């Protein structure tokens, strides 16, 4: 299920900070990202640059502290959002396809996933349930990762999003001043 993103305080907050978040992501080279660890679920090159996790047991948590030093403004923005569990940049290189899957097995059963487009192209998109969407720079998509979804970048430029997992109960919470 896709959620109507603009109504939530954290979405307005993230979108207001789009320029500095995009600028920090743009400083990263493809080599700075790690391959998404579950390699049997995709073809092509899906990479992640994790910089925040509240759960040290999460399989990407070890990379967060050193990575956070490379994106201090983005980390500061994300840390102010109530209910954030983890965050990072997700990179799909051209020709990448992520097969249909559900995220519940990855420990996000009670979380929603937010993607804020940073760089994309018209041939990059995602299907959640029966709805297909594409990423627009500076705009957020929120979806329930427990619902079947898939993604692809069939274009000729990389797709980069800020990926934030947030507790469902915190969606309406205002950002502290």
Give names to the regions the model predicted:
Residues 92, 119-121, 136, 144, ...:
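A short, compositionally biased micro-patch
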Residues 100, 117-137:
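A short beta-strand-loop-beta hairpin characteristic of the jelly-roll/cupin
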Residues 132-136, 147-168, 176:
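Acidic/histidine-enriched, beta-strand-rich ligand/metal-binding domains
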Residues 1-111, 121-124, 158, 173-177:
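Fe(II)/2-oxoglutarate oxygenase catalytic core
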Residues 98-101, 125-126, 143, 149-155:
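Short beta-strand His + acidic residue motifs that chelate non-heme Fe in jelly-roll/DSBH
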Residues 111-117, 140-142, 157-173:
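A short hydrophobic beta-strand segment most commonly corresponding to one strand
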């Amino acid at each position: 299920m896709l959620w109507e993103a603009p109504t939530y305080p954290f979405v307005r907050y993230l979108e207001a900070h789009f320029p500095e978040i995009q600028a920090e992501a743009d400083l990263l080279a493809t080599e700075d990202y790690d391959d998404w660890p579950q390699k049997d679920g995709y073809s092509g090159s899906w990479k992640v640059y994790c910089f925040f996790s509240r759960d040290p047991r999460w399989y990407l948590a070890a990379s967060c502290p050193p990575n956070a030093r490379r994106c201090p403004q983005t980390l500061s923005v994300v840390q102010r959002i109530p209910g954030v569990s983890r965050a990072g940049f997700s990179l799909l290189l051209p020709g990448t396809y992520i097969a249909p899957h559900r995220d519940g097995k990855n420990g996000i059963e009670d979380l929603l996933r937010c993607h804020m487009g940073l760089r994309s192209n018209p041939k990059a998109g995602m299907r959640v349930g029966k709805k297909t969407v594409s990423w627009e720079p500076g705009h957020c998509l929120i979806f329930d990762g427990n619902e079947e979804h898939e993604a692809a970048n069939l274009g000729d430029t990389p797709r980069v999003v800020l990926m934030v997992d947030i507790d469902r109960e915190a969606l309406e919470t205002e950002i502290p001043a």
